Amino acid sequence: MTTTSKTSVKGLTLDTGALLALERGDSRVRALLRRALERGLPLSVPAGVVAQAWQGGPRQTRVARLLADPSVHVAPLDDMTARAVGLLCGRSGHRDIVDVHVTLLAQEQGHTVVTSDPEDLSVIHPGLPLITV
């Protein structure tokens, strides 16, 4: 696991790769999320991330349990957010609206992003604190 920022973590925003790593039972991701929940850190997951990762069935017990935790906020892509995501897509030249929503949400909340794809997120927001899994 690699961290790109030395600032203290105020909360975590998860991308699709983070949920897929949890689904696979990745011990580093499980430990990171367990510590975050124990410390009472807020966790956010954009709704598009859930849509990309969700396939249902018994394989996703860990993901379902995490999403059901009251400390985890699944952020909707409502009208205002969709417009902000569209503007940021235009400014950054990045066309993946889920990646852009992850970045926007983390930036708004002062969160660190847990990601398997730091290169794409760094294109959108070069200074965004990341934990690579």
Predicted regions and their residues:
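Short loop/helix-cap segments at secondary-structure boundaries that form the rim of catalytic
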Residues: 119-127
